[in-house]
Amino acid sequence: VISIVDYGMGNLRSVEKGFASQGIEVRVTEDPGDIEGSSGLVLPGVGAFGDCVRNLRERSMTGPIKDFIASGRPFLGICLGFQVLFESSEEAPGEEGLGIFGGKVVRFCVAEKKLKVPHMGWNRVSAPEQTRILEGIPQQSWFYFVHSYHVVSDEPGADVLLSDYGGEFEAGVISGNLSAFQFHPEKSSDYGLMILRNFSKLCLEN
């Protein structure tokens, strides 16, 4: 079964509905014990980096999430669930992220380009070729974003997705069993839902 991690904040229901619309059964769980028995794990999230890592820690989910990722089973991070995979964020000085990936999260500096923060709405994404999670999705497809901070990764072996908002930024990272995106697949129409379908196929193969 695919589990969606409930840590008290985030876009859980919209992610759950996204999977359901594709006929994919998932469970939303706040029990760390459910993580180990999952075939796939989804970490969604909207909100603040510091609140997220504190909630995960207080609910004893940090260790099980790291163990799950290390097991090689499919993992999907969405929005804030993408950012917390990194080491730190300017949004929460002194708070450590999960540290799965090297790198940090920084605030958009786009005022001089007359752009608003948060970056909100549809934007094009360029993606690496031949990754299973993005199978069937053309280059420069549109995806839906809502975020004020963006990732600056230090992960040389990973495939990186790119978008542009007053300059190029990282819209996602794919590395082995782990796929994580700044945009919201569940809100990104057909191509976003295709990501959820591709993820479920990977889970079935597991």
Q: Where are the language model's segments positioned?
A:
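Cysteine-nucleophile active-site neighborhood
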Residues: 47-120
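Pocket-forming structural segment of enzyme catalytic cores
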Residues: 88-165
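An anion/phosphate-binding loop that grips the pyrophosphate of nucleotide cofactors and donors
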Residues: 38
